[in-house]
Structure formats: C-alpha cells, structure tokens
Amino acid sequence: MAKLHDKYKETVSPELVKKFGFTSVMQVPRIEKITLNMGVGEAVADKKVMEHALRDMTAIAGQKPVVTVARKSVAGFKIREGYPIGCKVTLRGERMWEFLERLVDIAIPRIRDFRGLSVKSFDGRGNYAMGVREQIIFPEIQYDKIDKIRGMDIVITTSAKNDEEGRALLEGFNFPFKK
C-alpha cells in the first residue's frame, strides 16, 4: 500500500475530523480520482506525435491512456470531427496513490522556477486543477527519448464540499501551496 494512503488514514483523516468537526469518518474529504490530460494539437499534421504522447503518458501514469477525439470540425485549426487531438488517463485506487506520491515528492520539486502552487486553482467544490509545462519533471521520462517537450493538465477530484476542505486535505499531503 502507498505511503500517502497510510498517511491519510493515520494522520490526515483524524486532523480533518478535528479541524472541521465531522461526526462520521465518511464525511471526511478524500481523493476520489486523479485525471491527467494531454492536448496534442500537432497530432493533426503528424500521426507520430500522438504515439510519442501516448508513450510518455503511459510511462507517467502506469496505465494506457484513452485517445480523445475532436467533437466538432474547426476549419481554422484544420481539425475534422473524430480526429485524435489528445489523450487522458483517469487514476483511481492504488495507482492514484502511487502517482500522487511521485507528484508531491519527486515531480513538483523538479519544476523549474517553482514558487508554490496557486490556491486559486480550486474550482469551488474542493477539486484542484494544475498544469505542468514539461513532462520531463517525472522520473519515468527519459530525457534523451523525448521528441518534444509537452505539458499536461492534472486534476485532483476530491469528495470535499468546498475549497477550504479541499485545501486542508491536500495540505495534509504536503502540497506546496503559495502562502
């Protein structure tokens, strides 16, 4: 079992019960899923680009991503309906905890010019979204094997009722928010 999952059960959950006065452990916010999304607009012109993006995403997430396709045709972007334009992975359970551990302990400290995560990235319902500009911050990506630096979106979906509970939950996992 992942260290962060044990930490959640042993320290984070009891702290949240004390802080917010929950009467049942089922009321305590928890992380439900983590979604990784990578938009690959260049895949329209070159099919190889999508293969590289899928390889990178598989290495980072530890599971095969789903290819996302365009819902509408957009002439300005030279995109037709059904064209592959990105990929995404939804992590739950054990893989989610392992990814979260790698994100907090290894990947975030490797971000260049990092000054803390923005508190404004909460959505009002306790979920947190962040963008990563380079996939090379993850240790699974070999620097000499990448064709292009790509970013991705990381969304952490929680069962928190509001941003305050969501922030307290993520701070329990040592997320480095700006003060």
Swiss-Prot record:
It holds the Pfam family Ribosomal_L5_C. GO terms for molecular function: rRNA binding; structural constituent of ribosome; tRNA binding. It comes from the Bacteria. GO terms for biological process: translation. The keyword Repeat does not apply. Keywords: Ribonucleoprotein, Ribosomal protein, RNA-binding, rRNA-binding, tRNA-binding. GO terms for cellular component: ribonucleoprotein complex; ribosome. InterPro entries: Ribosomal_uL5, Ribosomal_uL5_bac-type, Ribosomal_uL5_C, Ribosomal_uL5_CS, Ribosomal_uL5_dom_sf, Ribosomal_uL5_N. The keyword rRNA-binding applies. PANTHER family: 60S RIBOSOMAL PROTEIN L11-RELATED. Part of the 50S ribosomal subunit; part of the 5S rRNA/L5/L18/L25 subcomplex. Contacts the 5S rRNA and the P site tRNA. Forms a bridge to the 30S subunit in the 70S ribosome. This is one of the proteins that bind and probably mediate the attachment of the 5S RNA into the large ribosomal subunit, where it forms part of the central protuberance. In the 70S ribosome it contacts protein S13 of the 30S subunit (bridge B1b), connecting the 2 subunits; this bridge is implicated in subunit movement. Contacts the P site tRNA; the 5S rRNA and some of its associated proteins might help stabilize positioning of ribosome-bound tRNAs. Belongs to the universal ribosomal protein uL5 family. NCBIfam families: PRK00010.1. This is Large ribosomal subunit protein uL5. It comes from Shewanella halifaxensis (strain HAW-EB4). The gene is rplE.
